Amino acid sequence: VYGGLSAMKALSGPFGGIKFIPTGGVNAQNVGEYISAPFIHAVGGSWLCSKADIAAHRFDRITELCRRARAAALGFELVHVGVNAPDADASMELCRMLDAAFGLGVRPGNSSNFAGSAVEVMKAPYLGASGHIAIGTNSVPRAVAELEKRGFAVDPSTAKYKGEKLTAVYLRQDFGGFAIHLVQK
């Protein structure tokens, strides 16, 4: 499709059941944007594997470019840190303290309160002895597949969906007293 993401988005309206596999116009800087679009199935392109690198047998370079592309496509980044508080009062007290110290603001919630967007304070102990670390990704299902290849497992009982799309899930492993919460950006 000529016209990049905007053209594919326009076509996905009347043809909602189709998925695209763009190979032109995709590069290391925009692969995350492409792969996070709901109407994109996969991406590719010659930027990953140049003819010169193939001819010169620079497979280490090609492997590194592919690793970087995969990292860019997944787009892992810290979203917030979750702290386990014993109860709702302690949760609000900690949020107010963080607000007083750093001017983050306080946002009350159902099962937790937030100090700004960086700190979530649970109203009751939840996963992780100390709390959780929320890691955002461009695609939770793709992140799960990648993490499983790396030897990590998800806890399916924690999965959250928007319609049929997986939008959040916790990993089973403990990371220094913290659970890892994968969330859709």
Language-model region placement:
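Hydrophobic faces of well-ordered beta-strands that scaffold small-molecule active sites
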Residues: 19-24, 41-45, 81, 133
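Vicinal oxygen chelate
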Residues: 57, 118-123, 148-185
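Glycine-rich phosphate-binding active-site loops on the catalytic face of alpha/beta enzymes
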Residues: 1-5, 39-62
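N-terminal beta-strand motif that seeds the catalytic metal site of vicinal oxygen chelate
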Residues: 70-95, 128-135
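Alpha-helix-loop-beta-strand connector modules within alpha/beta enzyme cores
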Residues: 3-21, 63-73
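Catalytic cores of alpha/beta
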Residues: 6, 12-16, 26-42
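Amphipathic alpha-helical segments
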Residues: 87-102, 143-150
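Glycine-rich beta-to-alpha transition loops that act as phosphate-gripper elements at the mouths
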Residues: 1-2, 22-28
